[in-house]
Swiss-Prot record:
GO terms for cellular component: plasma membrane. Disulfide bonds: none annotated. It comes from the Bacteria. The gene is mdtC. This is Multidrug resistance protein MdtC. It comes from Escherichia coli (strain SMS-3-5 / SECEC). Belongs to the resistance-nodulation-cell division (RND) (TC 2.A.6) family. MdtC subfamily. Induction: The mdtABC operon is transcriptionally activated by BaeR.
Length: 1025
C-alpha cells in the first residue's frame, strides 16, 4: 500500500515521471530507422570466377570444386551453392545469423587465396567476392537511355562512373550493370578472304597483339635536360586498326581491312537491356544483408543529382524501380491503424464508464505506455516496421486493460460513496495483484519466442520485445499515474450520464442480469459444460491438423520479378525477340506502371524482368491476381516461358530461381541426377497444388561435337593446340588485346564475322596453317556432329544439385504443396542415390511447422509456471488456462472463414490469445479467492459473485482488445496481407472465448475446488490456499 500511496499523494512527481517516459519515447521515435520487417537477412557472400570459353563442366570441375573445398571449411557456413555456366562460376555462401559479415568476408578471401594454386593458370583474373545476395530483388533499379550515345558508351558511363560511386554509399552491397558490355573494337573476319590471302586467324591475332602494346620506352638526358620517350605504339579506334598490315602475300601488303570488318562496338554483343520499349542500360542495386533499405534508398536518392552531373546531358538517368514507396505506404497504413485502434479503445471505455472525466484517464495512460515503448525500441536497436507497429497496435488493447481494471475498481468504490483519494488507494490495493498477474503472465507468453532460434525467432523477437515493453510500461502507469489521476480527478458522487448514454447503461445492466440468470443454470449443469470444454479441445486438434498452412503471408509489395526460360538451343537474336514480346504483353496490362528487363551473358536462353505495379489505390487487383491474369497471356508465347512472382520482403537462400519456392535434388551420381530430374519435374508439373514448375537443370543445350583425327593431324603437321586456337579465334569472341584509356581499359575482340556463321557450314570454311605454311581446311582432319551438352552445372555443398522451383496457385497453401511433393516422390520410387529436400523459404517452413506445436506448449507451460508462482497453487493456473481451448477454436474457425492459411503471423495471434483470454479468468479467480477468504462464502457463491462483480471490467477489457484488433481485420491498402491474419486470429479467438469462458471458467473453478477437497488432508478447510 505504501507503494501506491507514494504516487497517489505525490501528483507532481507522478506527472513528471510520466512526462519523462513520454519525452524519452518521442526522442526514441525520431531516431528509429524505418524498415518493412525486422532485420532477418542471412549474411550472404557471392564468389565469382571466370575462364572465358570454358564449358560449364570444365568450370564446375576445375574452378568451382577447388573453391568449394576451400570455402566449405569456413566456420558458420549454413549453405553453399554454386552454378557454373559458359566461362563463369558463381558460388553463394550463406552464413548463420550470428556470423559477422565482415569477418566472414575476410575468411572468404583467405579461402580464395588458399585455393589459388589449384585453379587453372589461364584465368584472366583472380576470383572476387561481393557481400550481397544475388537472389534478392534489387532495392532500386536505375536506367540509362540516350538517343545520341550507343549502348556500349552508356554501359561505360554506368560501370565506370556511376556504379563505383553508388557502391560507396552506406548500405549498398552490389551494383550489377546489365543490358550491354564495355566498348570494344570488334574485328569480324572473312574466312574466304583469309584463305585467299593465305592468312590464318592466329596470324591476325598475333599481328594485332604486336601492333597494340603499351611498354615503357625510357628517357633521354643531356647535361641540362631530360626527355621522356613516347611512341605511337597504341591503336585506340576501329579506324586506326583498319589499315594495319597483318601479312604480306607475294610481296603485297595484306591489311586488316582487306580480310575483316573492323567496328567500334562492345565486348559482348550477346547482351540486351530494355526499359518499357526502349533500349537501356540497367543498374540493379542490392543492399548489404545488415543494411536498412529505407536509409539506403534515401542515401542513393540524395546522390542522384550529383550522379546526373557526372554524365553528359544527352544521357537520361531515371529511377525505373524503387522498393521504398510501398514500404512507406505500408507503414503509414499501420500507423493509421494504430491511431484508429487507440480511438476505438478509448470509445469503449467511454461507453462503459459513461463519464468524460473518467475516460480522460485511460486516454492519457494509453499514449504514455505506447510512446514510452519507442525509447526501449531504440535502445534495443529495433526499427519502425510492420511487425513492431502491429505489436503496438495490439498493445493498445492490452495497455488499456490494466488502466481499465484499476479505474473500474476505483470508480466502483466512488459510486459506493468513498472519498476519491481513499477510493484510489483502496481500489488499487485490491486489484494490484490482479494487474500484476495479468501483465506478468502475458509477458511470459513471449518468453519461448525470445528463445526461438533461426529466422522465425529473429523475425518474432522485435514483436515480442516491443509488446512486452509496452505491457511493462503499462503496468507501471496503471499502478502510478492511473490511481493518482483517479484520486485527484474523479468525484465521490455517481457520474452524471448523458441522456444518449443512459440506454447503453440500461442495456449493460440488463445484460449483466441475463448473464447472472444463465450462469445459475450453468452452475447447476456442470457436466454439460465439461463436455463442451472437452469438445473444444478436440476441435482445436482437428482444426489445426486440417487448416492450410504457410510460412509467411504472400505480400503485395507492388513489385513483380520474372524469369524467362527459353529453349536451351535458342540463339541470342531469338532470345532478344522473346524479351521484347514478353515486355509488350506486360506493358499493355493496365495495372503495370513500369517494366525493365535484360538478357544475355553466359546463359543466352534466360532473362530477367522487373515489373513495377501501379500503387494500390490505382488498381483493384492484388499482385497475385495480376500474375494469374498475365499467366494466361504469357502461356501463348511459343518457345519460352516467363515465370512471374511477387517480390517478398523475406527471401531465404542464395540460389536464384524463377519461382518463390524450391525443392532441391542432390546426388553424388551426376548421371542419376540427370536421369531422374526430368521425371520428377514432369510429375510435379501435373500436380494441381503447384504452378510455374521449372528447373535450373540445363543439360539439353545444342552442341557441335568435333572429333579430331589425330593420325591425319600428325601427317598434315597440325597439333591440337593449333586446332583449338582456331576455334577460339573464330567463334569465342576472343579478347586479343587491350586498349588503355584514362578512365578504363577496353578490349579488342576478334571472331569470324557473324554474317559467315549463320549455319553449320561455317566450319567448312575454317582452316589451319600447318608447319609448312600450307592452309589445311578443318574438314580434312575433323568430323563434327550435333550433340547435347549442359548449359549449366549446379552444386550444393560438394554434390551435384538440381533445384525445381514452383509457385502456389490461387487457393493453395504451402502445406498443400509440400504434402503433394512428398506423395509424388514416394509414388515415383526415386532411388536412394537421388535425395530430395525443400530449400529456401520452403525449408524454413518445414522447420517452423515442426516447432509450432512445441512453441505453443512451451508458452502455455511458461504461463502455468508464472501463475503457479504468483498464486502458490498447482490448481488455480489450470482454471485460468482452461480459457485457451475456446480461443483456439475461434481463431482457427475465423481463419477458415476468411480463407486465410495458418502462417507465422497467425501463430503470433495464437500466442497473443494465450495471454489475452486468461485475463478474464484471472479477474474471476482473484475475486472468488478474496471472497472465500474474507467473505466466508462457499466456492459456488464466491465464484458466482466474482463473475457478476467483474462482468463489467471483463466486458470492457475484452471489447477493448477486440476493438484494438478490429482495424487490423478491416484494414486495406499496402501491407494489409500482413495485418489481416493477425487481426482475424485475435478477433475470432476473442469472440469465441468471450462466449464460452464466462461459463466454463466458473465450472472449472468449482471442479478443481471439489477435486482439491477430495484429496486435501484438511477436508474441512473451505478457503483455497
Amino acid at each position: 500500500m505504501k507503494f501506491f500511496a507514494l504516487f497517489i499523494y505525490r501528483p507532481v512527481a507522478t506527472i513528471l515521471l510520466s512526462v519523462a517516459i513520454t519525452l524519452c519515447g518521442i526522442l526514441g521515435f525520431r531516431m528509429l530507422p524505418v524498415a518493412p520487417l525486422p532485420q532477418v537477412d542471412f549474411p550472404v557472400i557471392m564468389v565469382s570466377a571466370s575462364l572465358p570459353g570454358a564449358s560449364p563442366e570444365t568450370m564446375a570441375s576445375s574452378v568451382a570444386t577447388p573453391l568449394e573445398r576451400s570455402l566449405g571449411r569456413i566456420a558458420g557456413v549454413s549453405e553453399m551453392t554454386s552454378s557454373s555456366s559458359l566461362g563463369s562460376t558463381r558460388i553463394i555462401l550463406q552464413f548463420d545469423f550470428d556470423r559477422d559479415i565482415n569477418g566472414a568476408a575476410r575468411d572468404v578471401q583467405a579461402a580464395i587465396n588458399a585455393a589459388q594454386s589449384l585453379l587453372p593458370s589461364g584465368m584472366p583474373s583472380r576470383p572476387t567476392y561481393r557481400k550481397a545476395n544475388p537472389s534478392d530483388a534489387p532495392i532500386m533499379i536505375l536506367t540509362l537511355t540516350s538517343d545520341t550515345y550507343s549502348q556500349g558508351e552508356l554501359y561505360d558511363f554506368a560501370s565506370t562512373q556511376l556504379a563505383p560511386t553508388i557502391s560507396q554509399i552506406d548500405g549498398v552491397g552490389d551494383v550489377d550493370v546489365g543490358g550491354s558490355s564495355l566498348p570494344a573494337v570488334r574485328v569480324g573476319l572473312n574466312p574466304q578472304a583469309l584463305f585467299n590471302q593465305g592468312v590464318s586467324l592466329d596470324d591476325v591475332r598475333t599481328a594485332i597483339s604486336n601492333a597494340n602494346v603499351r611498354k615503357p620506352q625510357g628517357v633521354l638526358e643531356d647535361g641540362t635536360h631530360r626527355w621522356q620517350i613516347q611512341t605511337n605504339d597504341e591503336l585506340k579506334t576501329a579506324a586506326e586498326y583498319q589499315p594495319l598490315i597483318i601479312h604480306y602475300n607475294n610481296g603485297g601488303a595484306v591489311r586488316l581491312g582487306d580480310v575483316a570488318t573492323v567496328t567500334d562496338s562492345v565486348q559482348d554483343v550477346r547482351n540486351a537491356g530494355m526499359t518499357n520499349a526502349k533500349p537501356a542500360i540497367l543498374l540493379m542495386i542490392r543492399k548489404l544483408p545488415e543494411a536498412n533499405i529505407i536509409q539506403t534508398v534515401d542515401s542513393i536518392r540524395a546522390r542522384l543529382p550529383e550522379l546526373q552531373s557526372t554524365i553528359p546531358a544527352a544521357i537520361d538517368l531515371q529511377i525505373a524501380q524503387d522498393r521504398s514507396p510501398t514500404i512507406r505506404a505500408s507503414l503509414e497504413e499501420v500507423e493509421q491503424t494504430l491511431i484508429i485502434s487507440v480511438a476505438l479503445v478509448i470509445l469503449v471505455v467511454f461507453l462503459f464508464l459513461r463519464s468524460g472525466r473518467a475516460t480522460i484517464i485511460p486516454a492519457v495512460a494509453v499514449p504514455v505506455s505506447l510512446i514510452g515503448t519507442f525509447a526501449a525500441m531504440y535502445l534495443c536497436g529495433f526499427s519502425l516496421n510492420n511487425l513492431s507497429l502491429m505489436a503496438l497496435t495490439i498493445a493498445t488493447g492490452f495497455v488499456v486493460d490494466d488502466a481499465i481494471v484499476v479505474l473500474e475498481n476505483i470508480a466502483r468504490h466512488l459510486e459506493a460513496g468513498m472519498k476519491p483519494l481513499q477510493a484510489a488507494l483502496q481500489g488499487t490495493r485490491e486489484v494490484g495483484f490482479t494487474v500484476l498477474s495479468m501483465s506478468l503472465s502475458l509477458v511470459a507468453v513471449f518468453l519461448p519466442l525470445l528463445l526461438m532460434g533461426g529466422l522465425p525467432g529473429r523475425l518474432l523477437r522485435e514483436f515480442a520485445v516491443t509488446l512486452s515493453v509496452a505491457i511493462g510500461i503499462s503496468l507501471l502507469v496503471s499502478l502510478t499515474l492511473t490511481p493518482m489521476m483517479c484520486g485527484w480527478m474523479l468525484k465521490a458522487s455517481k457520474p452524471r450520464e448523458q441522456k444518449r448514454l443512459r440506454g447503453f447503461g440500461r442495456m449493460l445492466v440488463a445484460l449483466q442480469q441475463g448473464y447472472g440468470k444463465s450462469l445459475k443454470w450453468v452452475l447447476n449443469h456442470t457436466r454439460l459444460v465439461g463436455v463442451v470444454l472437452l469438445g473444444t479441445i478436440a476441435l482445436n486438434i482437428w482444426l489445426y491438423i486440417s487448416i492450410p498452412k504457410t510460412f509467411f503471408p504472400e505480400q503485395d509489395t507492388g513489385v513483380l520479378m520474372g524469369g524467362i526460360q527459353a529453349d536451351q538451343s535458342i540463339s541470342f537474336q531469338a532470345m532478344r525477340g522473346k524479351l521484347q514480346d514478353f515486355m509488350k504483353i506486360i506493358r499493355d496490362d493496365p495495372a503495370v506502371d513500369n517494366v525493365t528487363g535484360f538478357t544475355g551473358g553466359s546463359r543466352v536462353n534466360s532473362g530477367m524482368m522487373f515489373i513495377t505495379l501501379k500503387p494500390r489505390g490505382e488498381r483493384s487487383e492484388t499482385a497475385q491476381q495480376i500474375i494469374d491474369r498475365l499467366r494466361v497471356k504469357l502461356a501463348k508465347e511459343p518457345g519460352a516461358n516467363l515465370f512471374l512472382m511477387a517480390v517478398q520482403d523475406i527471401r531465404v537462400g542464395g540460389r536464384q530461381s524463377n519461382a518463390s519456392y524450391q525443392y532441391t535434388l542432390l546426388s553424388d551420381d551426376l548421371a542419376a541426377l540427370r536421369e531422374w530430374e526430368p521425371k520428377i519435374r514432369k510429375k510435379l508439373a501435373t500436380l494441381p497444388e503447384l504452378a510455374d514448375v521449372n528447373s535450373d537443370q540445363q543439360d539439353n543445350g545444342a552442341e557441335m561435337n568435333l572429333v579430331y583425327d589425330r593420325d591425319t593431324m600428325a601427317r598434315l603437321g597440325i597439333d591440337v593446340q593449333a586446332a583449338n586456337s582456331l576455334l577460339n579465334n573464330a567463334f569465342g569472341q576472343r579478347q586479343i588485346s587491350t586498349i588503355y584509356q584514362p578512365m578504363n581499359q577496353y578490349k579488342v575482340v576478334m571472331e569470324v564475322d557473324p554474317r559467315y556463321t549463320q549455319d553449320i557450314s561455317a566450319l567448312e570454311k575454317m582452316f589451319v596453317i600447318n608447319n609448312e605454311g600450307k592452309a589445311i581446311p578443318l574438314s580434312y582432319f575433323a568430323k563434327w556432329q550435333p550433340a547435347n551438352a549442359p548449359l549449366s552445372v549446379n552444386h550444393q555443398g560438394l554434390s551435384a544439385a538440381s533445384t525445381i522451383s514452383f509457385n502456389l496457385p490461387t487457393g493453395k497453401s504451402l502445406s498443400d504443396a509440400s504434402a503433394a511433393i512428398d506423395r509424388a516422390m514416394t509414388q515415383l520410387g526415386v532411388p536412394s542415390t537421388v535425395r530430395g529436400s525443400f530449400a529456401g523459404t520452403a525449408q524454413v517452413f518445414q522447420e517452423t511447422m515442426n516447432s509450432q506445436v512445441i512453441l505453443i506448449i512451451a508458452a502455455i507451460a511458461t504461463v502455468y509456471i508464472v501463475l503457479g508462482i504468483l498464486y502458490e497453487s498447482y490448481v488455480h493456473p489450470l482454471t485460468i488456462l482452461s480459457t485457451l481451448p475456446s480461443a483456439g477454436v475461434g481463431a482457427l474457425l475465423a481463419l477458415e472463414l476468411f480463407n486465410a492459411p495458418f502462417s507465422l503471423i497467425a501463430l503470433i495471434g495464437i500466442m497473443l490469445l494465450i495471454g489475452i483470454v486468461k485475463k478474464n479468468a484471472i479477474m474471476m479467480v482473484d475475486f472468488a479467492l478474496e471472497a472465500q477468504r474474507h467473505g466466508n462464502l462457499t466456492p459456488q457463491e464466491a465464484i458466482f459473485q466474482a463473475c457478476l462483480l467483474r462482468f463489467r471490467p471483463i466486458m470492457m477489457t475484452t471489447l477493448a482488445a477486440l476493438f484494438g484488433a478490429l482495424p487490423l481485420v478491416l484494414s486495406g491498402g499496402d501491407g494489409s496481407e500482413l495485418r489481416q491474419p493477425l487481426g482475424i486470429t485475435i478477433v475470432g479467438g476473442l469472440v469465441m472465448s468471450q462466449l464460452l469462458t464466462l461459463y466454463t471458467t466458473p465450472v472449472v473453478y468449482l471442479f478443481f475446488d471439489r477435486l482439491r477437497l477430495r484429496f486435501s488432508r484438511k477436508p474441512k478447510q473451505t478457503v483455497t490456499e
